[in-house]
Amino acid sequence: MRSCVRTASSVLQSWRAHTVLRNGCPLPSRTLERLPRLARSYAMAYKPQGELEKRIAEIPIERYRNFCIVAHVDHGKSTLSDRLLELTGTIQPGGNKQILDRLDVERERGITVKAQTCSMIYNYQGDDYLLHLVDTPGHVDFRAEVSRSYASCGGALLLVDASQGVQAQTVANFYLAFSQGLTLVPVLNKVDLPHADPPRVLEQMHDTFELDPEAAVLVSAKTGLNVASLLPAVVEKIPAPVGDLSKPLRMLLVDSWYDVYKGVILLVRVFDGQVRPGDTIRSFATGLKYIVGEVGIMYPDQTPQTVLKAGQVGYIHFNPGMKKSQEAKVGDTYTTLGSEKLVEPYPGFEEPKSMVFVAAYPTDQDNHEHLEDSIEQITLNDRSVTLQKESSDALGAGWRLGFLGTLHCSVFEDRLRQEHGANIIITPPSVPFKVIWRDGTESIITNPNEFPDQDQAHFRVQEVHEPYVQATITLPDEYLGEVIKLCESNRGEQKELTFFTATQVILKYDIPLSHLVDDFFGKLKGATKGYASLDYEDAGFHKSSIVKLNLLVNGAPVDAVSRVLHTSQVDKVGRAWVEKFKVHVERQMFEVIIQAAAGRRIVARATIKPFRKDVLAKLHASDLSRRRKLLEKQKEGRKKLRAVGSVVIEQEAFQKFLAK
């Protein structure tokens, strides 16, 4: 009974503190001392409203605008974001460039990897408007980031480079935004370049997307030319979000990241109701409940507020913090405790599928634990990476990592090296294969070592299917022949060829994913002198003739470098493997034979000759029988050594062999 009374009293006192904070008045110190620890921490953390918060509080939902910038990679999204932040006074002019590119790898490569958000206040015709901007990635590997960003937006700036024109990912991003009902504002960037051709690009946009050329805004994000005319276009053309403050809280989780002090921080879009520090909310996906510790907006960094209201996008973290990132399921719906039956949860987002797999091993097994911690920290902020432990006889304990594409994999590797100082060995990328067994069951195999050898496959496997993608390539017509030849040599199947202007072509090919990850984009850029662009989407699994290629050293397979590939590639890859591996293996006291084998068929072979001891040095030249006897004895000794001796291959040899 006493414990029940104590609990009820604690809840009542917490409610009192919460109520006083709602009324905007700080509590007296004597009252603070009588509160329980948790309620006291909320009350002491109270700060009076600042100037920014007062301005936001006076803006009705009808004057909110949530929008994103979408474009092909390197068309100037992040630079344009900087100009908009400067125009609204959110950041100082001429300060930190690419302010929404927060990762070192983003600044180094000049690309956006994670969608970043920022709120701005813009005064238009005497009224304040709350603008919420999302800077999205342009590369196809991060399409899931773009798709999630659209859920928090009512419109988008469709940005096109005035010199390059409509590119493959411009097309893909347009249809993705159009399918989600976003209002699109066409924007031409880099109009100040000498080779910019706005009339041609406007014609492309009209022919490809049926967008009105008169509605386009022509700007130069680098110099700031005409950028000021973009904000009125956002206010006038992009609709305000729909929401009801009087309804129970309905909040969508758009993204999350990990903070070592606060735990998991959630980026949320509030559709109905409002949320404040001290509220208890529940997740529909997990059923877990949390006490809100802090709410705020990104301005451009985390800026605490006393409330997040319907129509706003902001961040939230809990007290005590959410320590397991697995609890934060992107696409989840949250509501206040007790309102679960009054709120309809959102359907959530489709989980992105890993399309490329690599194995990762530490260069020194003593660093295994440190590397494991580093990988886990990065995967907390990038939920699209899949992780599974594995081990290799040659390279020791490691992990099988799944990525959305080769750039995603490369960025992850760079972050490991730059942010955590990790030294790692990464195997060449592989793709998942679907195996249909003779008993009718199916398996998706992502690890080449688990793929059945040709001898087993003959008895156990009925069919093997490999993943295909539909590649959309935009290019000038003068390179059409070279690109068709490249696609055909990579087992591509032509689906569509369209001239969307007199000199620009859109090609659509179904291409095996295994060829796409094998530097197809680099070859495409080489064939077109950098003028082609590429976008792709999943095209399902197609039946194919697939075998496993093993590298053998003195008859023993080296598991770390097994590969699954099409039969047409076996001879070429096998010969290249043997020649490359031979260079990195040191000579032994016995003969070392390196072979590439597909099942029992030896595709290629190389021999490393042993060190030779001169057993005839002390013999007289005429002693032929003794000479023959010593040579025979040496030959027998080598056979015995080869039978019982194991080839010592240094870790560095694997590192050099697996290097690109």
Curated annotation (Swiss-Prot):
Gene3D superfamilies reported for this sequence: 3.30.70.240, Elongation factor 4, C-terminal domain, Elongation Factor G (Translational Gtpase), domain 3, P-loop containing nucleotide triphosphate hydrolases, Translation factors
Domain tr-type G: 62-242
Catalytic activity entry: GTP + H2O = GDP + phosphate + H(+)
GO biological process, one term: positive regulation of translation
Localization, UniProt: Mitochondrion inner membrane
Entry annotated with the keyword RNA-binding: no
Residue interval of the organelle targeting sequence: 1-42
Keyword Membrane: yes
GO cellular component, one term: mitochondrial matrix
GO MF annotations in UniProt: GTP binding; GTPase activity; mitochondrial ribosome binding
Binding site for GTP: 71-78, 135-139, 189-192
Keywords: GTP-binding, Hydrolase, Membrane, Mitochondrion, Mitochondrion inner membrane, Nucleotide-binding, Protein biosynthesis, Transit peptide
Enzyme Commission number(s): 3.6.5.-
Function, as annotated: Promotes mitochondrial protein synthesis. May act as a fidelity factor of the translation reaction, by catalyzing a one-codon backward translocation of tRNAs on improperly translocated ribosomes. Binds to mitochondrial ribosomes in a GTP-dependent manner.
Protein family according to the UniProt entry: Belongs to the TRAFAC class translation factor GTPase superfamily. Classic translation factor GTPase family. LepA subfamily.
Name this protein carries in UniProt: Translation factor GUF1, mitochondrial
Species: Phaeosphaeria nodorum (strain SN15 / ATCC MYA-4574 / FGSC 10173)
